[in-house]
Amino acid sequence: MLQSNEYFSGKVKSIGFTSSSTGRASVGVMAEGEYTFGTAEPEEMTVVSGALKVLLPGTVEWKVYTAGEVFNVPVHSEFHLQVAEPTSYLCRYL
């Protein structure tokens, strides 16, 4: 079953799903802006198109991830994003 989610007054939208190849995941799009997300479980984020500038927990330097690149976020943590152009992503819940 698909589950639609909307965050930050509609600037981030995602569709959650479960598949045999991906497991539990969501795919979505972020509009330009700055966002902070919290995690309830470990997450693997893959940039599909565009770019995300990311500040991961325990780091002090921002890093840019572009299409095809992956970063991981630990359970029970926050990560910060800066988005300069509409960017799509795949988030796998590990």
From Swiss-Prot:
UniProt keyword list: Glycosyltransferase, Transferase
Annotated InterPro entries: Ppnp, RmlC-like_jellyroll, RmlC_Cupin_sf
Keyword tRNA processing carried by entry: no
PANTHER family: PYRIMIDINE/PURINE NUCLEOSIDE PHOSPHORYLASE, PYRIMIDINE_PURINE NUCLEOSIDE PHOSPHORYLASE
Reactions mediated catalytically: a purine D-ribonucleoside + phosphate = a purine nucleobase + alpha-D-ribose 1-phosphate; adenosine + phosphate = alpha-D-ribose 1-phosphate + adenine; cytidine + phosphate = cytosine + alpha-D-ribose 1-phosphate; guanosine + phosphate = alpha-D-ribose 1-phosphate + guanine
Pfam family, one: Ppnp
CDD domains membership: cupin_PpnP-like (cd20296)
Single annotated GO MF: uridine phosphorylase activity
UniProt keyword annotation of RNA-binding present: no
Matching Gene3D superfamilies: Jelly Rolls
Function, as annotated: Catalyzes the phosphorolysis of diverse nucleosides, yielding D-ribose 1-phosphate and the respective free bases. Can use uridine, adenosine, guanosine, cytidine, thymidine, inosine and xanthosine as substrates. Also catalyzes the reverse reactions.
Name recorded for this polypeptide: Pyrimidine/purine nucleoside phosphorylase
Protein family according to the UniProt entry: Belongs to the nucleoside phosphorylase PpnP family.
HAMAP family reported for this sequence: Nucleos_phosphorylase_PpnP (MF_01537)
Enzyme class at the top of the EC tree: transferase
GO cellular component: cytosol
EC number: 2.4.2.1, 2.4.2.2
